[in-house]
């Protein structure tokens, strides 16, 4: 692009850190002067303002973790929302072709791609930035451009790839009408850009810059892109033979290629090797707490004794860690993002944590989960299926016969010794006792204790450390004529800090979006290896060419990926029989990801890439019987279909549709299969 070409700089503030997110999101403030790119990219402030505009396009409909307004795909078969009428049912029926929810992702992503491309083509030196800083800024722009393409590819399927210099806005619509590239072409471009970005980006960020990517983030996203490319949805999927361009070009590979799994495994191995060598990334763990400091921070509960794991320190066992706190603290804001070695990439808080009215923030996400007692909306619920998926304390599966066997059995002072693997209070149904630590860090079951320690006003202090009930007639139970109640009778505790409260002078702790975690890399590695045929070896060069990996279905390497995640959770590793059997191992990985990444948007896309979504999202949603009051509490826990949450799945819902407005602008764009085209 000509350096003397004048462009309008849509500027936002410089900050990308946690303390300035409210300013960062104020994208309505524009820098009105028209300035040449030469002047802009020779000035540090203007350059960083330009880059900040690119970051702003990661917000809104491009968020990956949030409440239903911006992240409806954070609600698969695991969690639901009960607000604003039939929005959930419409989403589940795929009635969102030309609705505003989620459709801005296309435009916002290409805005970010275009602006990042201009920066990459114009910024080579800057009088106020050191050469190292210039390289890092270029790396950030390159990462963002690749990440926007990745978000588009995952959601919409194959997408147009603009020229590296960016589209020339002076051209007519017809001249800018690019068709979709094939899925493999998209993957090749995105991964190659991430490899370059990995050589440009800084390795570490402080807490004020935590929302900026690092070398590790580039390598991790690269692994994620390769994993999706190897998955059944886009690897030899003949059911997508009709996903074509207008000239008839097929966009989804029709022949299965096992080597793609080897590439995915090698890419994950790249990140694992880099993490271990640099010491920058690992699973977060919290040391054993020998003495309770507060009711909200209890003494460590040791998992049931296991001869192999109970006496070994992490990662070979759990003797020196608190599995419950290790998982809970990952998400609830008790540790600074920059001090969390598991967090590879995050958007930060996505808003101002001090303003409880701010939309699209992690704080607002939590407010949707909080009971009305504590000033929350009380509209996010967990499905019965998800609550049943959590194991018992010893790692065995939850037995659905318990609904009959334990009918009428509740905790009390006399049976405390029978449920020593939890901190459940009295009056709680027995099915919620003796469960694995991740259950108690994630599930707000009926009778769970909410701490709300930040309450300051005298009128609310008695509500600290309070049990919340969802029985009909209870303060937070079913309310006729209102949306503000937990429709499944099972709430969500994940992301909630013991201090969180939205009334009585309380506040909700600042917390960051867990966009990409090291646990994901480990489980991706194991999954990819599992899909390689027994006895087959692939030689794959590392991302930087420094070594060659011998990739095969190596059970010990698969264990290297799974075991640390299980040890951190306080549950036993899989048996040798599971590691030996690819089908059984896949079933375990599906389950492990369902639990480990609950409410992180992973489930929605995992089910699709595995091509098992129809059997999961197509089934009816069950919950507790919220029509029952406390007098009939034994009936509350008998599973019932939640009639208000109608759901279905059709083939078209594998990918999102392109809106009519975008199809009008680009005559060369084809619509995703099953969706109405614009003629």
Identify the residue ranges that each predicted region occupies:
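Short coil/turn linking the two alpha-helices of tandem helical-hairpin repeats
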Residues: 153-154, 158-160, 205, 228-237, ...
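Bacterial Sec-dependent N-terminal signal peptides
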Residues: 1-29
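Long, intrinsically disordered, low-complexity segments
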Residues: 21, 109, 189, 265, ...
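Conserved, well-structured interaction surfaces
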Residues: 43-62, 82-156, 173-215, 428, ...
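Extended amphipathic alpha-helical segments enriched in small hydrophobics
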Residues: 146, 222-223, 510-572
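Membrane-proximal, proline-rich intrinsically disordered regions
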Residues: 21-69, 419, 430-433, 663-679
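Segments forming glycine/polar-rich beta-alpha architectures that bind adenosine-containing cofactors
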Residues: 344-347, 353-449
């Amino acid at each position: 692009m000509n350096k003397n070409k004048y462009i309008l700089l849509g500027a936002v503030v410089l900050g990308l850190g946690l303390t300035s997110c409210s300013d960062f999101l104020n994208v309505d403030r524009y820098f009105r002067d028209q300035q040449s790119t030469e002047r802009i990219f020779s000035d540090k402030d203007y350059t960083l303002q330009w880059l900040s505009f690119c970051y702003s396009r990661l917000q809104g409909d491009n968020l990956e973790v949030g409440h239903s307004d911006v992240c409806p795909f954070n609600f698969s078969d695991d969690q639901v929302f009960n607000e604003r009428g039939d929005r959930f049912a419409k989403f589940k029926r795929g009635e969102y072709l030309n609705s505003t929810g989620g459709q801005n992702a296309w435009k916002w992503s290409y805005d970010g791609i275009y602006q990042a491309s201009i920066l990459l083509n114009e910024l080579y030196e800057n009088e106020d930035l050191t050469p190292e800083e210039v390289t890092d800024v270029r790396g950030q722009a390159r990462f963002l451009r690749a990440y926007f393409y990745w978000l588009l590819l995952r959601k919409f399927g194959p997408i147009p790839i603009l020229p590296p210099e960016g589209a020339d806005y002076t051209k007519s619509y017809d001249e800018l009408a690019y068709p979709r590239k094939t899925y493999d072409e998209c993957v090749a471009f995105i991964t190659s850009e991430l490899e370059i970005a990995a050589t440009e980006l800084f390795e570490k960020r402080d807490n004020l810059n935590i929302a900026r990517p690092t070398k590790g983030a580039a390598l991790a996203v690269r692994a994620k892109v390769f994993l999706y490319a190897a998955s059944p949805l886009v690897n030899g999927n003949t059911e997508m033979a009709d996903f074509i361009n207008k000239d008839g070009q097929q966009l989804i590979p029709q022949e299965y290629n096992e080597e793609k799994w080897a590439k995915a495994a090698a890419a994950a191995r790249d990140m694992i090797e880099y993490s271990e060598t640099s010491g920058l990334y690992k699973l977060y763990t919290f040391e054993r707490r020998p003495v309770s400091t507060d009711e909200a921070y209890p003494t460590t509960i040791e998992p049931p004794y296991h001869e192999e794991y109970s006496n070994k320190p992490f990662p070979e066992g759990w003797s020196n860690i608190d599995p419950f706190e290790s998982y809970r603290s990952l998400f609830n804001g008790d540790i600074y993002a920059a001090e969390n070695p598991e967090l590879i990439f995050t958007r930060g808080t996505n808003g101002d944590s001090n303003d409880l009215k701010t939309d699209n923030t992690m704080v607002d996400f939590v407010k949707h989960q909080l009971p009305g007692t504590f000033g929350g909306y009380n509209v996010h619920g967990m499905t019965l299926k998800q609550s049943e998926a959590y194991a018992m304390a010893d790692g065995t599966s939850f037995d659905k016969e318990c609904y009959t066997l334990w009918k009428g059995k509740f905790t009390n002072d006399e049976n405390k010794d029978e449920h020593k693997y939890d901190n459940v209070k009295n009056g709680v149904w027995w099915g919620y006792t003796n469960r694995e630590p991740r259950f108690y860090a994630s599930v707000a079951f009926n009778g769970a204790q909410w701490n709300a320690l930040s309450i300051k006003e005298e009128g609310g202090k008695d509500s600290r450390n309070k049990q919340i009930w969802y029985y009909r007639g209870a303060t937070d139970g079913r309310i006729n004529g209102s949306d503000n109640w937990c429709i499944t009778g099972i709430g969500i505790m994940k992301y909630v800090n013991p201090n969180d409260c939205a009334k009585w002078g309380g506040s909700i702790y600042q917390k960051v979006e867990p966009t990409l975690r090291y646990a994901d890399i480990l489980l991706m590695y194991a999954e990819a290896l599992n899909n390689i045929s027994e006895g087959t070896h692939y030689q794959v060069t590392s991302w930087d060419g420094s070594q060659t990996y011998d990739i095969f279905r190596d059970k010990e390497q698969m264990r290297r990926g799974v075991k640390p995640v299980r040890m951190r959770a306080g549950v036993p590793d899989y048996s040798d029989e599971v590691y030996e059997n690819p089908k059984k191992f896949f079933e375990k990985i599906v389950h492990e990801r369902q639990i480990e990444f609950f409410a992180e948007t992973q489930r929605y896309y995992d089910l699709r890439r595995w091509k098992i979504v129809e059997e999961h999202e197509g089934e009816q949603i069950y919950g507790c019987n919220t029509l029952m009051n406390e007098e009939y509490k034994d009936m509350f826990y008998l599973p019932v279909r939640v009639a208000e949450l109608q759901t279905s799945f059709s083939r078209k819902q594998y990918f999102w549709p392109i809106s009519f407005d975008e199809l009008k602008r680009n005559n060369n764009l084809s619509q995703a299969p099953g969706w109405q085209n614009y003629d």
